[in-house]
Design a protein with these regions (language model features):
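Bilobed "Venus flytrap"/periplasmic-binding protein-like clamshell domains
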Residues: 1-9, 19-20, 66-126, 134
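A generic secondary-structure signal marking the coil-to-beta-strand transition
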Residues: 33-35, 50, 66, 128, ...
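Acidic-enriched, low-complexity/disordered segments with a strong bias for Aspartate over Glutamate
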Residues: 16, 35, 49-50, 56, ...
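Pocket-lining segment of extracytoplasmic ligand-binding domains
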Residues: 114-185
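Short, well-ordered helical secondary-structure segments
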Residues: 41, 57, 84, 88, ...
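Hydrophobic/proline-rich hinge and linker segments of small-molecule sensing/allosteric domains
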Residues: 57-76, 158-175
Length: 185
């Protein structure tokens, strides 16, 4: 990404760069083990009193994103109350999937968060699974036979007419108050 490239090549002088999954970054910022981080939009919403959004930078999609997918053994309209697995690497995508399944497909599945692999995308006993990142891209470009694939950004756009904001950059309000010059970009 242009932002991470810029940070790695000089824009982050004097800063420590941590590479981690979105869920790990969310947890570290919530625990105040990070001062500034990319954070899921749902985590920001849950902790808005403690975090400050950094303007002009986000992870969003105005259509297909290909890296946030529901992979299912059955059409989404047939998921109902069946079991759906959630990637342990995400937070916003969990909330997004739950909203889409409930509102667009009248489904209220049993959810279980766990590690998932594209080699066995929908394990026995599950109707579907939520994938993000490289694993989702692999499944998008090489879909297994007999599997339905739903791009959640496209589903959101069709349902709401709005783009989906998956993540934003945020700073702990205490850090922002103590170091305002360091947040100028």
């Amino acid at each position: 990404l242009p932002l991470t490239y810029a940070l790695a090549h000089g824009a982050a002088q004097g800063l420590d760069i941590l590479r981690a999954t979105p869920a790990q970054l969310n947890g570290r910022l919530e625990a105040r083990n990070l001062d500034v981080s990319g954070v899921s939009s749902i985590t920001y919403a849950r902790h808005a009193d403690d975090l400050l959004i950094l303007p002009d930078v986000c992870i969003a999609s105005d259509g297909d994103v290909r890296s946030v997918l529901l992979v299912s053994r059955v059409p989404a309209e047939n998921i109902g109350a069946r079991r759906v697995l959630l990637s342990d690497k995400s937070a916003s995508s969990h909330a997004l999937l739950k909203i889409i399944l409930r509102r667009a497909y009248d489904a209220v599945p049993q959810y279980e968060t766990r590690a998932l692999t594209p080699e066995d995308p929908v394990p026995e006993g599950a109707a579907g699974a939520l994938f993000i990142g490289d694993d989702a891209l692999e499944l998008y470009h090489h879909p297994p036979e007999g599997i339905y694939i739903y791009d959640l950004a496209r589903e959101w756009k069709q349902m709401t007419g709005a783009r989906m904001v998956f993540g934003i950059w945020a700073a702990a309000r205490t850090f922002a108050a103590a170091h305002p010059a360091e947040l100028e970009m």
